[in-house]
Amino acid sequence: IDTAGKERVLHSFGNGTDGSEPFGGLVALGGRMYGTTFRGGATNGGIVFSVDTAGKERVVYNFGLGSPVVPDGRNPESTLTVLNGTLFGTTYNGGVRSAGTVFNLNTAGDESVLYNFGGPGDGAHPYAGLLALKSTLYGTTSAGGAHGEGALFSISARKERVLYSFRGGSDGARPDGGLIALDGSLYGTTYKGGAHDRGTAFSASTQGKERVLESFGSSTAGGADPFAGFYVLNGTLYGTTTQGGSHRQGVAFAMTRAGKERVLYTFGSDSAGAAPFAALTDWNGMLYGVTAAGGATNHGTVFQISP
C-alpha cells in the first residue's frame, strides 16, 4: 500500500498448506519479506513464510513437525526479529511443556528451539516477538511467571532469565505487546492490570526493575486495554489502545518517557476505523497503523495520523 492508499494484494492465504491467519507483520531479509501464520501448514500449527514484492510466496518452515521427545513449537503470532542474518521468533503454543517456545531459523528453513517456556515460575504463551539488544533477546509472555500474570524475560546463549513477574495488580497483567528500547531502558504495555484494570504502560531496566508510567482507563477520553507495544519517534513513545476514548473504540496516543500521555486521535467517530490492535510505524514524519474494525465495510482500515 502506498501513502495515497492504493493497495495491491501480494498473496492470498487460505489453501491450507501455505498458512492462514497471519497475525504478525513482515521483516525484510535478503531481498524478501518474512512472516508467520498462526495456523495452516503441514500440521495446521502455523508456518514461517517468505514473499517477494511480486507476491511469490514460499513456505520456509512448518511448525509442529518435531518429534514426541523434542516437540516443536506451534502457533506463532508475532513478527520475526532479524539478528546477524538469522530469524528469531516465538510460538504461543508447543514445545516440551506446551507453553510456547523461542526459536531461530535460517532462510533455508533450518529451525532450532532455543527455549521451552512453562517451567516453575517461568513465563508461558508469548504473544509478542523479540527485541534484540546486542547479543541478548528480550521479550514478554502473556501468562506464567511467579504470579501467573505474565513475565518479562531475557535469553542469551540459550539461557533464559525471568526479569520480572507481573502480579496482576497495580503493576499490570498480560503484557501481550512487544518491547522497545530507549536510552538503555525497556518500554512496553500490559493489556490488563493497573489502577483501573484496563492496562498499563511500563518501563523496566534490563535487570528487571519495573516502573508503571501510566494506568489506562482513568478517564472517559483516555484509552484502555492496549494490546500492542510502543513505537518510538524522535524520543517520544507512540501507541494504540483497543478500547477507551470518548467513543469507546480505542485511541492513538503519544507518551513521554515520564508517562505523560496525550491522545492524538479517538477512533469510532467516522470511517477512520475502530479497535486498533497493532503497533504504529512511521514514514516521512507521519504515523501509520491499522484497525481491526470500522471503516466503510466494518472490516478495518489503514490510517495515517500526524504525531
What are these regions (language model features)?
Residues 1-307:
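Extracellular beta-propeller repeat domains
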